[in-house]
Amino acid sequence: MNNRAGCLVTNLSGEMAYQSFRPNPLPPEPPIEMSNELIAKLIDANRRLATLDGLSSRIPNMDLFVSMYVRKEALLSSQIEGTQCTLDDILNPFAEENTNLNVSDVVNYIRAEEYAINRLQTLPLCNRLIKETHAVLMEGVRGQEKNPGEFRYSQNWIGGQGSTLRNARYIPPNPEDMVDAMSDLEKYMNGEDSLDPLIQAALIHYQFETTHPFLDGNGRVGRLLITLFLMEKKILSAPSLYISYFLKMNRVEYYDRMTQVRKTGDYEQWVLFFLQALSDSAEDAIQTIDRLTEIHNRNVQKFNSMTKRQQTNAINFLIYLEK
């Protein structure tokens, strides 16, 4: 395998020999082909994200809305990795004290996302921030023994339970190539590129997942990078998008599309899929905001028809619900 996306590299020798994938730096060469289909999807995704960002700034109780969306994204992203947990578990006011490892995984994702968003105010989207976020994600949960906050020093692989280097579905870059790949990715995230930021986000997510720099937690960090990059590029002013629902519902295609890039160098089919994920996710969020605004307006009308005492009781009740 030697194509636009990278090549296979033989490691060790004899019976111990195996091949890992060495990704080429971004952006792809030759450049992404801007077909009519891709341009149409790009315009649609940008339009919906702009609508979402405009609406999200006007929604009643923005902090509560974002808090719920962060929890929903954390849950769905963790479920993609096989975490067995429900939204009720996460909304439980005692979730942080829950000893259930599945709940702890999701609670840590919430902490990691909040940490990373705050850290973006003082750091660019860089490997230091990625490592710090990973450390928060893995603190005190399954995988905490796998060097949280540090890039791996050993070879990892992707496959079913009990798989080995010999029968793995995919073997990411060896440790030396991984360090080079993450250095290249850091430069790309902070460099100048004529590509639209949404296409850049697609490439960055693919490249991170392909590089798999950690021993555990790569998928969750990779999906979190999407939100962080869109916020850094001012596409989103708040984490009001949960793309993991689309990726979970299309999980097989999600993985197959990235595999196709590695095998054939066809970035375009991956970018098309990613743009569709952004469009559908943004539209879902827009509809949610519309419904919440409608409910809010109905409640305001009811509130205005109440007596002073009823209004006071209603306000206290709503404050209680929002805690």
What spans do the regions from the language model cover?
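FIC/Doc superfamily catalytic core
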Residues: 1-323
